[in-house]
A protein has these predicted regions:
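Conserved ATPase "switch" residues in P-loop NTPase domains
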Residues: 44-45, 250
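The serine-hydrolase catalytic nucleophile loop
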Residues: 30-41
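Conserved SAM/SAH-binding loop
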Residues: 263
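Flexible "cap/lid" subdomain of the alpha/beta-hydrolase fold that forms the substrate-access gate
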Residues: 1-19, 23, 31, 51, ...
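Active-site machinery of serine-nucleophile hydrolases
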Residues: 45-54
């Protein structure tokens, strides 16, 4: 279903559960969409109101051509904030994964009183949570030379925006990949990334990701000052956001439950039932 924002953006989202119940906002990551939560949502919806929007540039959210929308994490967070305003959601627990993490933490900086709890599933807010995967992207963040930037964008495109790399994000780090291989996930993601102009959107966001790293100290300050309860449930074999990022929450979060599972980046695909159970136990005791 869609919500039309005041600026004309059509946000596609999935929703389940009664709006009279506490809300859980599910924020997906690269290269996915709210489709990644298709199996988790029913596990949560009996007790909670669950909302999962597609971020701008992903899934089926539509940006009007005449809006001249700049694809940045600041604008993604602003868009999701507007989506929440339209739905009159002013209190919510937030599940952050991959790109959903800087989106969720930016929302928290804007409205710290809105967040009732955080579930971080490989959703990073610490330098030590960035693996060597990010080294070429650090070069992209650092350069201001247009020629060098063009070369780096092409290199990143060839390494990351491919079908093989997309499939690898789902199956990498999984001890038994054949048992959790769901081709619809990576085929859908790659098809959506293959739309005209979408590769440039993804490269713009890779370039902009450095602005999130600059904000990591602010995200950490928020965690310390708000003392929001955090469930960090991570795939310990993630080569993009390694478990050191989960361990780092210990520095700033007093009310922390940390669980490392034998899986990779897309842990919600391989450990859906376990994540659902952990979330329900955690949220039932916190909100």
């Amino acid at each position: 279903m869609y919500t039309i924002l005041p600026n004309g953006i059509r946000v596609f989202y999935r929703e389940a559960g009664s709006p009279s119940k506490p809300t859980i906002l599910l924020l997906h990551g690269f290269p996915a969409s709210s489709f990644q939560f298709r199996n988790l949502i029913p596990l949560l919806a009996e007790k909670y109101h669950v909302v999962a929007p597609d971020l701008p540039g992903f899934g089926f959210t539509e940006i009007p051509d005449n809006l001249n929308f700049k694809y940045s994490f600041a604008n993604i967070a602003t868009t999701i904030g507007s989506f929440l305003d339209v739905h009159k959601i002013d209190k919510f627990a937030v599940y952050v994964f991959d790109y959903g993490a800087p989106t969720g933490f930016r929302l928290a900086l804007e409205c710290p009183q809105a967040i009732t709890a955080i579930i971080s599933q490989n959703g990073n807010a610490y330098e030590e949570g960035l693996s060597s995967f990010w080294d070429p992207l650090r070069q992209l963040w650092a350069t201001s030379d247009p020629v060098k930037e063009k070369e780096l964008r092409q290199a990143v495109k060839g390494a990351v925006l491919t079908f093989e790399a997309t499939k690898g994000q789902y199956l990498g780090g999984e001890p038994e990949p054949n048992k959790i291989d769901e081709p619809a996930t990576y085929h859908l993601d790659y098809a959506l990334m293959s739309r005209p102009g979408n590769a440039e959107i993804q490269l713009d966001l890779f370039k902009d990701y450095g602005t999130n790293v600059v904000l990591y100290p602010k995200f950490q300050e928020y965690l310390r000052e708000s003392q929001v309860p955090v469930l960090a449930v991570w795939g310990k074999n993630d080569i993009i956001f390694p478990p050191a990022g989960a361990e780092a929450f210990k520095r700033d979060v007093k009310d922390l439950k940390l669980v490392l599972l034998d899986g990779g980046h897309f842990l919600v695909e391989s450990h859906t039932q376990e994540i659902g159970r952990l979330m329900l136990e955690f949220l039932d005791s916190k909100i």
